[in-house]
From Swiss-Prot:
Domain of life: Eukaryota
Pfam families in alphabetical order: Omega-toxin
InterPro entries tied to this protein: Omega-atracotox
Keyword terms: Calcium channel impairing toxin, Disulfide bond, Ion channel impairing toxin, Knottin, Neurotoxin, Secreted, Toxin, Voltage-gated calcium channel impairing toxin
Record-given protein name: Omega-hexatoxin-Hf1a
Length: 37
């Protein structure tokens, strides 16, 4: 079975995250990426 993605790691969907929450964050380069909360 798939393991959940930890906080701070890139994610496609909320369901992939251990926290069940994947939101857009701005990284150090100013790019917007979805990461687990």
């Amino acid at each position: 079975s798939p393991t959940c993605i930890r906080s701070g790691q890139p994610c496609p969907y909320n369901e992939n995250c251990c926290s069940q929450s994947c939101t857009f964050k701005t990284n150090e380069n100013g790019n917007t990426v979805k990461r687990c909360d």
